């Protein structure tokens, strides 16, 4: 059928099983074709086609609330709710968002992007329903990877205690982005092979009834036998003990099995957890056979061969970080690395190949990773926690309370710092400077290129004065020559890239090329601009700031971070605190709003951070030049 005609999920409710199976095949082909051009989260969505069809067949969205954890697996939901015609612009500037978006559709009742939030949101909605006296169903769909997150476990505990009518669909594909780790993953592994829980439970109850319960010690012994049998024979007891009715495992690609269990859950009082087994990448062989997470989120690819289309490019910043860390670790046994379920994205999977005993993937658990790093540091090791800027937010209290307060030697390698593009507002790494720079003991650096990055990694390893963060962007470097010998960069020192007499631009990282081009444009108007690589965001280069302030030149601070509370604010604070009240200073950075999806270049133009926009802004601070005769 024409998927663009699916303007409402009610249209599939009257379909036969055969028609739904045909629709599932058409949706898979649609996704494979569309995402081969736009890129996106292919593997997760191919795995939930039948599950999404079953949910929309049995429940009445948007009255019934479907909450997608992380949200990257909601493409099928978007197709069924009238958005198939927008997939040519998936994750493109001003196009269809890759995650649920409340202002995009009434069927997107909760926005996600980070993991492990759905159960808490579902608990809130179920509680509100009961307080208002309405009767809608609340269903949270969460993956086995996201279920390892501490917030999800906190919510399970609360939901089970309160006994709210709420359905949790556990989408178990044995992977999140990378293969899952941890004890809970092992519990789910045993459940996958345990057979149907409800049948086992009924058989067990029959067996227990045959155990006599007569007086005294014999009665106590009988109860112990009953408990032992229960734990021995019924694998679903983990969730039952949390207060849930457990259903499953259910074949996530069998519509009959899905429908039967969803119907049972719908009429069951109290919280229900349906354990659904799915195959990530179902229906497309390259994605089905992916064991590393390559097909979780992809760019352009060739459908026939499954070849990912990548243009030749210099090494990525993540790759340079990991290679440098390996190089140093060969001679420094103190170095250990941590990741929170992102070994591939951070490139620590390469570190793990060489140092498997010194690399720790803790799962989706940034809080735990941060404090574990602190524990390692107290014992004389040098822990390196590689984490995306947007995900470090999840471990903020631990950064404050456990690391900075104790002044522990933990190295935070902050990946994806700055705008990240297509993943949009939930993933832009623009807040870390603002939330880190005011913390006592924290140091923050950012390199201008990949060569400076390797020196900063070395500097951070050698630093013994407490916590230090080196932030670096998504994407590739510039292909410049890399120094063979690593050296320390003095913390608190800046670099003069270009001398000038009319104004000064203070910038760092990805904004340096923008500033260089802006200064060229201004030079054509007769202006001479001084350009500073402010690579040490904290501490500032106070000696240079004194000299700049005394020169009397206008100052422009330029950063690809939230302008409020970040680097520019620090410079203004310095001028104010030292009595330089006459220094004309202009801040430029990310405005006070969340930045949506699009290419980085499109987003920079939208928020006013292109070279011509920077040049125009700085020119307003400068006296007009007299035209030469």
Curated annotation (Swiss-Prot):
One GO cellular component, as annotated: cytosol
Coiled-coil segments: none
EC number of the protein: 2.2.1.7
Domain of life where this protein originates: Bacteria
Cofactor: Mg(2+); thiamine diphosphate
Note describing how the cofactor binds: Binds 1 Mg(2+) ion per subunit.
Any single Pfam family the record assigns to this protein: DXP_synthase_N
Molecular-function GO term, any one: magnesium ion binding
General function of this protein: Catalyzes the acyloin condensation reaction between C atoms 2 and 3 of pyruvate and glyceraldehyde 3-phosphate to yield 1-deoxy-D-xylulose-5-phosphate (DXP).
Family stated for the protein in its record: Belongs to the transketolase family. DXPS subfamily.
Name of protein: 1-deoxy-D-xylulose-5-phosphate synthase
UniProt organism field: Halalkalibacterium halodurans (strain ATCC BAA-125 / DSM 18197 / FERM 7344 / JCM 9153 / C-125) (Bacillus halodurans)
This protein's encoding gene: dxs
């Amino acid at each position: 059928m024409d998927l663009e005609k699916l303007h409402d999920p009610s249209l599939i409710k009257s379909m036969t099983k055969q028609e739904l199976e045909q629709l599932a095949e058409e949706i898979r082909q649609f996704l494979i074709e569309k995402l081969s051009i736009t890129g996106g989260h292919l593997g997760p969505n191919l795995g939930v086609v039948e599950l999404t069809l079953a949910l929309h067949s049995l429940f009445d969205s948007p009255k019934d609330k479907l909450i997608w954890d992380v949200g990257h697996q909601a493409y099928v939901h978007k197709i069924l709710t009238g958005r198939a015609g927008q997939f040519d612009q998936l994750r493109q500037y001003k196009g269809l968002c890759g995650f649920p978006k409340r202002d995009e559709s009434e069927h997107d009742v909760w926005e996600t992007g980070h993991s492990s939030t759905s159960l808490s949101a579902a608990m809130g909605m179920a509680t509100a329903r009961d307080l208002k006296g309405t009767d809608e169903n609340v269903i949270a769909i969460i993956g086995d990877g996201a279920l390892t997150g501490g917030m999800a476990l906190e919510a399970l505990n609360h939901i089970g205690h309160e006994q709210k009518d709420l359905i949790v669909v556990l989408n178990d594909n044995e992977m999140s982005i990378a293969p899952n780790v941890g004890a809970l993953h092992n519990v789910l592994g045993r459940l996958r092979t345990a057979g149907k829980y409800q049948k086992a439970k009924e058989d067990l109850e029959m067996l227990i009834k045959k155990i006599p319960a007569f007086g005294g010690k014999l009665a106590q012994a009988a109860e112990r036998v009953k408990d032992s049998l229960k734990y021995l024979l019924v694998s679903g007891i983990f969730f039952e003990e949390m207060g849930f009715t457990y259903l499953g495992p259910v074949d996530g690609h069998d519509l009959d099995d899905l429908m039967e269990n969803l119907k049972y859950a719908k009429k069951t009082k109290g919280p229900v957890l349906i354990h659904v087994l799915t195959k990530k990448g179902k229906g497309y062989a390259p994605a089905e056979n992916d064991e590393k997470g390559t097909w979780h989120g992809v760019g352009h690819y060739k459908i026939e061969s499954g070849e990912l289309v990548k243009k030749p490019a210099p090494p990525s910043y993540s790759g340079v970080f990991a290679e440098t860390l390996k190089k140093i670790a060969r001679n420094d046994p103190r170095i250990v690395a941590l990741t929170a379920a992102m070994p591939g994205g951070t490139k620590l999977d390469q570190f793990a190949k060489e140092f498997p005993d010194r690399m720790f993937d803790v799962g989706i658990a940034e809080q735990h990773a941060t404090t574990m790093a602190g524990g390692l540091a107290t014992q004389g090791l040098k822990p390196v926690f590689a984490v995306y800027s947007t995900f470090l937010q999840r471990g903020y209290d631990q950064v404050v309370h456990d690391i900075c307060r104790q002044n522990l030697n933990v190295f935070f390698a902050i990946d994806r710092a700055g705008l990240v593009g297509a993943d949009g507002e939930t993933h832009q790494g623009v807040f870390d400077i603002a939330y880190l720079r005011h913390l006592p003991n924290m140091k923050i650096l950012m390199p201008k290129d990949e060569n400076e990055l390797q020196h900063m990694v070395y500097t951070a390893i050698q630093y013994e004065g407490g916590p230090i963060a080196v932030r670096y962007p998504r994407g590739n470097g510039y292909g410049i020559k890399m120094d063979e010998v690593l050296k320390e960069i003095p913390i608190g020192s800046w670099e003069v890239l270009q001398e000038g007499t009319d104004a000064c631009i203070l910038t760092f990282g990805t904004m340096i090329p923008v500033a260089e081009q802006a200064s060229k444009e201004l030079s054509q108007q007769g202006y001479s601009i001084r350009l500073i690589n402010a690579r040490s965001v904290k501490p500032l280069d106070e000696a240079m700031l004194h000299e700049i302030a005394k020169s009397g030149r206008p100052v422009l601070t330029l950063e690809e971070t939230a302008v409020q509370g970040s680097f520019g604010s620090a410079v203004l604070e310095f001028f104010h605190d030292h009595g330089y009240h006459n220094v004309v200073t202009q801040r430029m950075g990310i405005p006070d709003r969340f930045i949506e999806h699009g290419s980085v270049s499109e987003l920079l133009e939208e928020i006013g951070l292109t070279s011509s926009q920077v040049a125009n802004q700085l020119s307003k601070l400068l006296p007009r030049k007299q035209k030469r005769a």
